[in-house]
């Protein structure tokens, strides 16, 4: 008799995705981040669900409800910090996953790549709205500053901002709707993840060499289930280390002060994982220009597949492109640092140089380097 996992309508889907899936035999640890992101999403949904049971989305009680979770709810502090730091882990995995995609040319799977970009935007929107919910100083002012950016849109900007706010400033209506969106978006993200995987399984995984691996496949289980399990263990260990030893390491002390519309914090800045984009936004003195640069900093990923001029898919055997890639990584770290600094000399200039370099590497230098490498290899 045929195994039930191969015949049952539901188990068959799981079998084709996680058990009998033919996978390349040489995929490295860089291919672990997809499954790690799945784990992060699950942790966020579960901890978020338990937090939502005790949280109140009202300006008068939001801050104290978070305090109540940490002080009075059984293991509430653990759930809250797992959720907050889980978001940081989520973004670390996200950026590594995207970086892997750029390095190994995975972006040539256009549908998978584009769904991935939509996923990135959705996760960023979710994280931003989640940061507003504790209703601390940075929550309030972060929401005010970021939503205000939409007022740069010509003609409809101001109306749009007031429509999002549900009034003339960030207030009760804003907090309530942000909570509603923050709750629903992870489920939309889960649906998008399924589409992402659906498109990936149409083509199969890429591999470090960038060469088709149809002649050399191994079953996903037990090889990659074991490898993923090790990844889960390491990531969860790192998350627990962060949560149990230094839960506020990545947070902002200002968010322990209740939101006060009459007092502006000295430095308004988002969570660390948005600082690179924030630095790009601030590096342009014009409001609309800054907003466009901010959006383009992520949207530029959609252009990358069309700028692939190399005869090879992966960067494994392309030293010039490799050097540019790691300069890009260093540049993003520089932008992250600048985003957290005050707007003064020399940080303004460093931010502007780093922003120009960011777009130059992706849009100009990498395609040029690929052409040079083709010439070197006489292709």
UniProtKB/Swiss-Prot annotation:
Q: What is its main location?
A: mitochondrion
Q: Which residues bind heme b b562?
A: 83, 182
UniProt cofactor note: Binds 2 heme b groups non-covalently.
Q: What does this protein do?
A: Component of the ubiquinol-cytochrome c reductase complex (complex III or cytochrome b-c1 complex) that is part of the mitochondrial respiratory chain. The b-c1 complex mediates electron transfer from ubiquinol to cytochrome c. Contributes to the generation of a proton gradient across the mitochondrial membrane that is then used for ATP synthesis.
The subunit structure is:
The cytochrome bc1 complex contains 11 subunits: 3 respiratory subunits (MT-CYB, CYC1 and UQCRFS1), 2 core proteins (UQCRC1 and UQCRC2) and 6 low-molecular weight proteins (UQCRH/QCR6, UQCRB/QCR7, UQCRQ/QCR8, UQCR10/QCR9, UQCR11/QCR10 and a cleavage product of UQCRFS1). This cytochrome bc1 complex then forms a dimer.
Topology with respect to the bilayer: Multi-pass membrane protein
Any one Gene Ontology MF annotation carried by this entry is: metal ion binding
> Could you provide one GO biological process annotation from this protein's UniProt record?
mitochondrial electron transport, ubiquinol to cytochrome c
Looking at the record's lineage, which domain of life comes first?
A: Eukaryota
Residue ranges spanning the membrane: these are 33-53, 77-98, 113-133, 178-198, 226-246, 288-308, 320-340, 347-367
Protein name (record) = Cytochrome b
Q: Residues that bind a ubiquinone, according to the entry?
A: 201
Q: Name one GO cellular component term.
A: mitochondrial inner membrane
Q: What else is known?
A: Heme 1 (or BL or b562) is low-potential and absorbs at about 562 nm, and heme 2 (or BH or b566) is high-potential and absorbs at about 566 nm.
What species was this sequence derived from? Pentalagus furnessi (Amami rabbit)
Please state which protein family the record places this protein in. Belongs to the cytochrome b family.
Q: Which InterPro entries match?
A: Cyt_b/b6_C, Cyt_b/b6_C_sf, Cyt_b/b6_N, Cytb/b6-like_sf, Cytochrome_b, Cytochrome_b_C_euk/bac, Cytochrome_b_N_euk/bac, Di-haem_cyt_TM
The SS bond pairs are none
Task: Name the Pfam families on file.
Answer: Cytochrom_B_C, Cytochrome_B
Q: Which UniProt keywords apply?
A: Electron transport, Heme, Iron, Membrane, Metal-binding, Mitochondrion, Mitochondrion inner membrane, Respiratory chain, Transmembrane, Transmembrane helix, Transport, Ubiquinone
